[in-house]
């Protein structure tokens, strides 16, 4: 049988946190340091209990040194808890740059931070602690142990600043972000990227094709707007038009193809070889894609492919 090894400090912190939450215990006085209990937990038991189940907290030790790694030398604070604060309290008086510098003292070599200096978040005074809950989520239990943020709630974190985009997620056609199948970080690198919207790929199309591989091509007959930018026709975050289109068909098609079938008024019927006069032959609704179905590109021979028809 495999033997497991427990972390006494971790078990103690979790136990104290539960006791405090139930009203069965109160933080021990400072003199309890002599008993070897975690120093910071004597006053901050609830915070330590939440912190203990994060990735940072897995390095918790009985001396409280892990706390000083971020908050700085706490000697003066221990001597006078009410009158002296640690050097770094991460409050409003501390600049975003100063907060981030503390995190970078350990995470500076992280490859995800390679473009942090050129990213929009840094330029807009966003600090690591604005997005990451360093002490853990105390209001809700962590879905996966040792994570400082929860993937399920990621869109809510981003939505605190990006409110207009958060609203688009409630539209009838949207990426399954609310359903938990797609996360903001699947497309964007919040720590910085070379692209304007901090997308993970070099271009919007490269990003979209990473999932929608059937639209990549190459095709014998290409639809040039598709090759240029998927966002020419689609709104990536949400739309009230099916398939995330920016506007309805045929208006969307007419933005470029204004002269196509110009002899027919909108809503009128027109003859289609071998077809009856029904909704399939009316110049409205899905009329364009009833015939031109291969709008992302076609490998059909001769002129059928040229016009992207099925």
Each model region followed by its residue ranges:
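Short sequence/structural segments immediately N-terminal
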Residues: 28-310
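Intrinsically disordered, low-complexity proline-rich regions
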Residues: 1, 15-18, 56-59
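N-terminal secretory signal peptides that target proteins for export/translocation
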Residues: 1-10
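Bacterial N-terminal signal peptides
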Residues: 12-25
């Amino acid at each position: 049988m495999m033997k497991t090894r427990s972390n006494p400090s971790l078990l103690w912190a979790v136990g104290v946190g539960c006791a405090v939450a139930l009203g069965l215990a109160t933080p021990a006085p400072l003199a309890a340091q002599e008993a070897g209990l975690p120093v910071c937990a004597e006053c901050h038991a609830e915070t330590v209990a939440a912190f203990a189940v994060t990735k940072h907290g897995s390095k918790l030790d009985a001396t409280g040194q892990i706390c000083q790694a971020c908050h700085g030398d706490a000697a003066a604070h221990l001597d006078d808890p009410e009158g002296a604060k640690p050097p770094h309290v991460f409050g409003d008086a501390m600049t975003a740059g100063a907060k981030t510098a503390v995190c970078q003292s350990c995470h500076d070599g992280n490859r995800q931070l390679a473009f942090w200096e050129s990213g929009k978040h840094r330029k807009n005074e966003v600090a690591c602690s604005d997005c990451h809950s360093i002490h853990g989520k105390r209001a809700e239990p962590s879905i996966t142990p040792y994570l400082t943020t929860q993937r399920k709630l990621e869109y809510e974190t981003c939505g605190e600043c990006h409110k207009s985009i958060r609203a688009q997620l409630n539209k009838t056609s949207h990426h399954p972000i609310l359903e938990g199948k797609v996360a903001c970080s699947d497309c964007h690198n919040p720590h910085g990227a070379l692209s304007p919207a901090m997308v993970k790929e070099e271009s919007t199309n490269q990003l979209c094709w990473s999932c929608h591989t059937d639209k990549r091509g190459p095709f014998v007959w290409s639809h040039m707007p598709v090759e240029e930018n998927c966002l020419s026709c689609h709104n990536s975050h949400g739309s009230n038009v099916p398939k995330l289109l920016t506007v309805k068909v045929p208006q969307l098609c007419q933005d470029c193809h204004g002269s196509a079938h110009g002899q027919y008024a909108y809503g009128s019927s027109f003859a289609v070889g071998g077809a009856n006069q029904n909704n399939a032959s009316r110049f409205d609704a899905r009329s364009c894609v009833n015939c031109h179905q291969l709008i992302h590109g076609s490998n059909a021979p001769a002129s059928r492919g040229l016009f992207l028809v099925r």
